[in-house]
């Protein structure tokens, strides 16, 4: 239990930020899975559409500070390679 006012505030902020980060991280996993499932089905049109949405979301997460720029670029690049292989 926090003893100082500032510690209590930091504890509250941590709860809010943890919840927000969990939302973004879950959505990242979901958009990644949607691309991979389209690739698995060899559905080029669906994969390209899902990849476009994933690319936008990864870069949105970078602007929010959820992911680092290099991490997002690496993930997008690896997904794009799989989409291009169809």
UniProtKB/Swiss-Prot annotation:
Example GO biological process: translation
Entry keywords, A to Z: Ribonucleoprotein, Ribosomal protein, RNA-binding, rRNA-binding
Entry annotated with the keyword Nucleus: no
Keyword RNA-binding listed: yes
A GO MF label: structural constituent of ribosome
SUPFAM superfamilies from the UniProt entry: Ribosomal protein S20 (SSF46992)
Cellular component per GO, a single term: small ribosomal subunit
Function: Binds directly to 16S ribosomal RNA.
Family membership: Belongs to the bacterial ribosomal protein bS20 family.
HAMAP family found in the cross-reference section: Ribosomal_bS20
Name of this protein: Small ribosomal subunit protein bS20
Organism: Aliarcobacter butzleri (strain RM4018) (Arcobacter butzleri)
Protein's gene: rpsT
């Amino acid at each position: 239990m926090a003893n100082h006012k500032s510690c209590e505030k930091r504890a509250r902020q941590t709860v809010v930020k943890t919840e927000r980060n969990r939302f973004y991280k879950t959505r990242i996993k979901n958009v990644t899975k949607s691309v991979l499932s389209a690739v698995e089905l060899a559905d080029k049109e669906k994969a390209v559409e899902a990849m476009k949405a994933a690319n936008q979301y990864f870069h949105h997460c970078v602007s929010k500070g959820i992911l680092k720029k290099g991490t997002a670029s690496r993930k997008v690049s690896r997904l794009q390679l799989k989409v291009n292989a169809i």
